[in-house]
Amino acid sequence: MYPIYWVEAFDEATQKWIPVDPLVTKTVGKSRKFEPPMSDSENNMSYVISFEDDGSARDVTKRYAKAYNAKIRKTRVEVTTDGDKWLKRVMKMYKRLHRLDRDQVEDAELARKEAQEGLPRNVQDFKGHPYYALERHLRSHEVIHPEREMGNIYAGRAGSEKNVEPIYRRGDVHVVRSADRWYRLGREIMASFLIMYHVY
């Protein structure tokens, strides 16, 4: 079993929130014990919202999720159109009026946890990933430039070298448009520019 609510205590000496679950897992300071497996369809950790005694709240899912960008992010409202704006608008109602020093420390901790996540472990987790991309998941109007490989992933059977795919940075994925589409957006292609990509 996995908890659906627990307590966090702020340790002023280490400037960290310590999770305490006296009911289900009976653990202190073991945040990785709270996340149910992805195979459990009736209990998933899409959102972890922490509430403080002053009525403020914040999203701390990154603190507890093992694969936030690869798995959890796809189950959240932010992946829908304007879902990110909606969630920010909702959470703004619970925002603390005056930020404390520990809020900045917590922001840095959550950003560090997200950065430490590393590469996804399977091909499907690269689809829609905010930091990494595979060429097979690009849309017809997207192109990778420059083609700087971040690593490789094996797709298919182990040991087969023809199934090795390069991993690229999501920041190197660019949207391309036809001359007509650029014209409709109020822009014009300069005569000296070369065509980078053809769509057939």
Predicted regions and their residues:
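Long, composition-driven mixed-charge/polar low-complexity segments
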Residues: 1-5, 10-200
